[in-house]
């Protein structure tokens, strides 16, 4: 907040606290004022029973509740500040993908921006979500581009807030033509197309993941969705109060779910920092991870005068990346800060090992990573491959920052010579 804004706020505060503001002191209400207040109350209360109003009231309460979660779980002022901004960004994303969703006129909503990457999402990826229902049939037309990995997770009805997978396609099973074009049908009957998902028993959304090795060289996939309506060209019906209420409830569910990931997705990792465990999508659910995804999850703890040396074996897979997250599972400043790396931007050491150095700010090591200013947080090592792949768990060594050059001298010297 700028100093001029502070000055304005202070001046306003002083203005209303001086003796000259005695005229602003509460005055006895006249009968006319009382009648006006009663009319205003009556005018607002007559709409209170609307489903959209009730849903919005619940969302307001959840915002307050989530702010208390941040205050209760944060360990530092920085985590509180980042946490409040995280809530703002999470709410914005929930509004984008759920609040603005319309199954009658569907569109793919981008889940992140150049400054927003929350929910443990991969910084080297793009995510899109579209809200659907099974009262309509749909078709998706697109092009797979040249990204390392593309997947469509089609989610059915929700049980206790969690989604079930009713269809999954990746860049191979979409069977694109020579130009990369593909089509995917979502219908309540078989349209006679091999790339088809039966939505007879319900469909709620599709989550699209694009994993990128090198943003400068790879072309993102493109795709659009349309309703297969026999009355093509007819005007989309006006949205109803019930539909808006459902959209607000969906926004609230997404907001509260993402705001509490640090409590629901392996929070015990923070109790035993600087180590990794293995996991896959079965451990999280389709609404969090893709069927092709495998993970090594960990947490970090490092002081300003320290560094973490992360050692692992290079993975022989089509895609992998390592991401540093805050306590709130946010990739802080991901477009301007080195908080993530892929297989395309690392150097393998002469001994065949892959090493990363995580610290507060840049270090001389070629595979350096930045904490984003946080002493503690999560680490996500994800890759795309067969489920029977058994990768060696990375090992984390906590050292003094001043010791880095003596420990990794050869690697650092080689990097500086390039």
Question: What do these predicted ranges mean?
Answer:
Residues 1-9:
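Bacterial N-terminal signal peptides that target proteins for export
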Residues 24-27:
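C-terminal region of N-terminal signal peptides and the immediate post-cleavage residues
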Residues 31-33, 37-418:
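A compositional/structural signature for long, glycine/proline-rich flexible linkers
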Residues 10-14:
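Hydrophobic helical h-region of N-terminal Sec-dependent signal peptides
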């Amino acid at each position: 907040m700028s100093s001029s804004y502070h000055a304005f706020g202070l001046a306003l505060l002083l203005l209303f606290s001086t003796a000259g503001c005695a005229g602003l002191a509460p005055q006895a209400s006249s009968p006319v004022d009382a009648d006006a207040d009663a009319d205003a109350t009556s005018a607002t209360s007559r709409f209170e029973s609307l489903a959209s109003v009730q849903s919005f009231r619940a969302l307001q309460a959840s915002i307050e509740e989530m702010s208390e979660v941040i205050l209760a779980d944060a360990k530092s002022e920085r985590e509180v500040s980042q946490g409040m901004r995280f809530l703002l960004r999470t709410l914005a994303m929930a509004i984008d993908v759920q609040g603005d969703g319309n199954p009658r006129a569907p569109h793919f909503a981008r889940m992140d921006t150049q400054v927003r990457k929350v929910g443990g999402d991969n910084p080297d990826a793009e995510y899109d979500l579209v809200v659907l229902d099974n009262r309509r049939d749909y078709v998706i037309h697109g092009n797979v581009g040249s990204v390392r990995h593309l997947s469509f997770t089609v989610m059915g009805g929700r049980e206790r807030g969690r989604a079930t997978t009713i269809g999954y396609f990746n860049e191979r099973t979409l069977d694109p033509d020579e130009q990369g074009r593909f089509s995917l049908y979502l219908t309540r009957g078989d349209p006679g197309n091999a790339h088809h998902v039966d939505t007879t028993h319900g469909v709620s959304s599709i989550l699209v993941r694009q994993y990128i090795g090198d943003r400068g060289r790879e072309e993102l996939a493109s795709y659009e969705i349309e309703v297969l309506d026999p009355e093509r060209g007819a005007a989309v019906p006006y949205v109803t109060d019930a539909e808006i209420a459902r959209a607000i409830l969906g926004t609230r569910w997404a907001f509260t779910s993402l705001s509490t990931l640090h409590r629901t997705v392996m929070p015990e990792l923070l109790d035993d920092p600087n180590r990794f465990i293995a996991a896959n999508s079965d451990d999280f659910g389709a609404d969090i991870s893709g069927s092709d995804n495998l993970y090594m999850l960990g947490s970090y703890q490092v002081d300003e005068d320290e560094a973490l040396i992360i050692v692992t074996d290079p993975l022989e897979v089509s895609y992998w990346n390592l991401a540093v997250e805050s306590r709130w599972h946010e990739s802080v400043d991901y477009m301007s800060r080195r908080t993530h790396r892929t297989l395309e931007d690392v150097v393998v050491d002469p001994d065949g090992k892959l090493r990363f150095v995580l610290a507060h700010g840049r270090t001389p090591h070629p595979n350096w990573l930045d904490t984003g200013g946080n002493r503690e947080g999560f680490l996500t090592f994800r890759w795309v491959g067969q489920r029977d792949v058994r990768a060696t768990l990375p090992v984390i060594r906590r050292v003094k920052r001043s010791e880095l050059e003596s420990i990794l001298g050869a690697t650092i010297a080689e990097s500086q010579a390039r």
